[in-house]
Design a protein with these regions (language model features):
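Short, Lys/Arg-enriched N-terminal segments with co-localized hydrophobic residues
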Residues: 2-15
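Flexible beta-alpha connector loops of hexameric P-loop NTPases
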Residues: 101-111, 167
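C-terminal boundary of histidine-terminating zinc-finger modules
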Residues: 235-246
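Residue-level signature of catalytic and energy-coupling elements of molecular machines
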Residues: 25, 97, 116, 137, ...
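Walker A/P-loop phosphate-binding motif and the immediately C-terminal alpha-helix
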Residues: 17-54
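N-terminal phosphate/diphosphate-binding loop that engages ATP/GTP or pyrophosphate donors
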Residues: 39-99
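Conserved catalytic-core segment of NTP-binding enzymes
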Residues: 122-129, 133, 138-222, 231
Length: 262
């Protein structure tokens, strides 16, 4: 059955662009994805954001800072038969799903991602809603079979890696690049490049540029460090929603536009 779901995802959504964002935990990946999703929605696109992390906090900035119900949480409770149980539309208009994960110490988080993706496929959610973009926000510290799910079977068309110039962040990025290259099925996602989320460490852009060259991956976009990000998070919102006229909002909008152009 799983194979048929993979094949189905290879065929559907000719107009829909499915994009996976990977990166080390704590690097600002979810913040980046959430602001890109909000910026694309602001442009008039229908956007889905799918959180693929057992912490289930990818979409909190579309939900007033609160964690929503998850696919796996609904399944564990004996539900999950209707997407209304776990799909919600955020304050900025983004459609949000959190895959969720097992109870701590009781199972494999990667397997949980697989189970959640299968339920989303069984309910034909993307066919029903016809989004323009589906953004997968994926934990990139460990790229096991489950967390590599968006790279397989046509779930994602493109992959971006979010990193800073910090050593461990770049190490995680290198592992993600290896994972993308190791997946050789016909629907392998295209690695588009690195999004630098600056931490303002010494010679940061030079360090990322050198690492990117070594990995054979281009630097796609560089986001400056801004206190507006923390201020927006304190409000439980994206920068795009909380500070629409700010310089940081303009940066996220530029990134979203570049991603949309492909």
């Amino acid at each position: 059955m799983r194979k048929s779901i993979f094949l189905m995802h290879c065929k559907i959504g000719e107009k829909m662009k499915k994009i996976a964002f990977y990166g080390k935990g704590g690097i600002g990946k979810s913040t980046t994805v959430s602001n890109v999703a909000a910026a694309l929605t602001k442009k008039g696109y229908k956007v889905f954001q799918v959180g693929c992390d057992p912490k289930s906090d990818s979409t909190v900035m579309h939900n007033g800072g609160k964690r929503p119900a998850t696919v796996l949480g609904c399944i564990r409770a004996g539900g999950g038969e209707d997407e209304s149980e776990f799909l919600f539309r955020g304050t900025s208009g983004v459609f949000c799903i959190e895959a969720g994960g097992p109870q701590p110490g009781t199972g494999c988080a990667g397997r949980g991602i697989i189970a959640a993706f299968e339920r989303i496929a069984e309910l034909n959610i993307y066919e029903k809603y016809s989004p323009d973009f589906v953004l997968f926000d994926v934990l990139g510290d460990v790229v096991c079979g489950g967390f590599a799910m968006p790279l397989r079977g046509g779930y994602a068309d493109e992959v971006y890696i979010v990193t800073s110039g910090e050593m461990m962040s770049l190490y995680a990025a290198e592992n993600i690049v290896r994972a993308v290259k190791n997946i050789g099925n016909p629907c392998r996602a295209l690695l588009k490049g690195i999004i630098v989320n600056k931490k303002n460490i010494e010679k940061e852009e030079e360090k990322v540029a050198a690492a990117a060259e070594e990995m054979g991956v281009p630097v796609f976009f560089t986001l400056p460090r801004s206190m507006e990000v923390q201020k927006a998070e304190a409000l439980g919102k994206t920068v795009v929603e909380a500070f629409p006229g700010s310089e940081m909002c303009a940066e996220y909008e530029k990134l979203a536009e570049k991603i949309a152009r492909g």
